[in-house]
Amino acid sequence: MDVKYDLNSYVRVLKLASTPSWQEFSQISKIAGAGIFLVGLLGFIIFAVMSFLPGGV
């Protein structure tokens, strides 16, 4: 395990990284929000189906 090599790798990545533009940030936020919404909706649908089935929740 070469700590100096690892630190140099991290510094190189940070130098290449840049702050996203407002348009990129907005698009990523919308996609992440839609994903969170869909996962929540799927969970709600599963809960609703399980509560209507006999022996469910």
Curated annotation (Swiss-Prot):
Which Cys-Cys disulphide bridges does the record give? none
HAMAP family referenced in this protein's UniProt entry, alphabetically? SecE (MF_00422)
Provide a Gene Ontology MF annotation, just one: protein transmembrane transporter activity
List the gene name: secE
Q: What does this protein do?
A: Essential subunit of the Sec protein translocation channel SecYEG. Clamps together the 2 halves of SecY. May contact the channel plug during translocation.
This one is known as Protein translocase subunit SecE
According to its UniProt entry, this protein's organism is: Haloferax mediterranei (strain ATCC 33500 / DSM 1411 / JCM 8866 / NBRC 14739 / NCIMB 2177 / R-4)
Biological process terms in GO annotation: intracellular protein transmembrane transport; protein secretion; protein targeting
Q: Where in the cell is it found?
A: Cell membrane
Membership in a protein family: Belongs to the SecE/SEC61-gamma family.
Task: Please give the subunit comment from the record.
Answer: Component of the Sec protein translocase complex. Heterotrimer consisting of SecY (alpha), SecG (beta) and SecE (gamma) subunits. The heterotrimers can form oligomers, although 1 heterotrimer is thought to be able to translocate proteins. Interacts with the ribosome. May interact with SecDF, and other proteins may be involved.
Kindly give the membrane topology term recorded for this protein. Single-pass membrane protein
The UniProt transmembrane annotation reads 33-53
